[in-house]
Regions:
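Aromatic-rich, lipid-facing transmembrane alpha helices and their immediate juxtamembrane interface loops
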Residues: 1-154
Length: 154
């Protein structure tokens, strides 16, 4: 799919639902939802790309500017995914909403966050990935966790 392994769109599809459930609960407008949801999806990619490079799925000849601790991924890759994620989140936010129990998507989102930080740091020895991904996702995850615990929807 345009040089992207099919696993990536499948993973993003799996992640899109819990991200949208979380960001729709946090944001007041569709545009805010798109930016917050886009940030959360793209920051998750900070964990994915180093794994994909490590598995040999892709590499860049001209890295340009990179984040310290993530030397194999050019920053323009993150920016491209960020724009794609904002567009995707905006489009998904246009779909009709219906009331749904958010326990499963909430659990999935927390599990993905925690497991990616732990896996990057301890299993793959990628401390920079754990820090950048953990901080970037944490900018949304921690306020969202505060929101769901302080304002439960029953």
């Amino acid at each position: 799919l345009l040089g992207v392994p099919i696993l990536i769109p499948m993973a993003w599809s799996m992640m899109a639902y819990p991200v949208m459930m979380a960001t729709q609960r946090m944001a007041a407008t569709p545009l805010t939802t798109a930016f917050i949801g886009g940030w959360l999806l793209a920051s998750w990619d900070l964990f994915l790309d180093p794994m994909m490079v490590g598995e040999g799925y892709w590499r860049w000849n001209d890295l340009g500017w990179v984040l310290p601790g993530i030397p194999d991924i050019p920053m323009q890759n993150f920016l491209g995914w960020l724009l794609s994620a904002i567009f995707l989140a905006f489009a998904l936010n246009l779909l009709p909403r219906k009331a749904a129990n958010d326990t499963v998507p909430n659990t999935l989102l927390i599990w993905i966050y925690v497991s990616n930080v732990i896996a990057a740091a301890f299993f793959f020895g990628q401390i920079g990935v754990a820090l950048w991904g953990g901080i970037a996702m944490g900018l949304v995850i921690f306020p969202w966790i505060w929101r769901i615990w302080s304002q439960p929807q029953w």
